[in-house]
Amino acid sequence: MQPGGQPDMSALLAQAQQVQQQLMEAQEALANAEVHGQAGGGLVQVTMKGSGEVVGVSIDPKVVDPSDVETLQDLIVGAIADAAKQVTILAHDKLGPLAGGMGGLGLPGM
């Protein structure tokens, strides 16, 4: 703080640049991370990148029944939803602490 209670703008700028760099690094790490979702007790598994891209699907042959395709479809949707939930948790874990760091800049409303 400068005299008169005003924040030191150069220090604020340096801190903002540091937080921005950390945020970019965390976003890159998140995009490159992989999470796994599953349904049916692991009979259907999905691998998803942190960006949301599905990069793999594994289906146990036990759930492949030509007369009951609907169940398999439901399991695939469930596994994708589980993987998406894992991405959300990962994003919160990686990016959440950085959002908290913005409050320390000494700016009103942050």
UniProtKB/Swiss-Prot annotation:
Gene3D superfamilies referenced in this protein's UniProt entry, alphabetically: Nucleoid-associated protein YbaB-like domain
Pfam families the UniProt entry points to: YbaB_DNA_bd
Record keywords: Cytoplasm, DNA-binding
A GO term, aspect molecular function: DNA binding
Localisation: Cytoplasm, Nucleoid
GO CC aspect terms: bacterial nucleoid; cytosol
InterPro entries per UniProt: YbaB-like_sf (IPR036894), YbaB/EbfC (IPR004401)
Residue pairs linked by disulfide bridges in the UniProt entry: none
Alphabetized HAMAP family for the sequence: DNA_YbaB_EbfC
Subunit text: Homodimer.
Family note: Belongs to the YbaB/EbfC family.
Annotated function: Binds to DNA and alters its conformation. May be involved in regulation of gene expression, nucleoid organization and DNA protection.
Protein name: Nucleoid-associated protein Mflv_1287
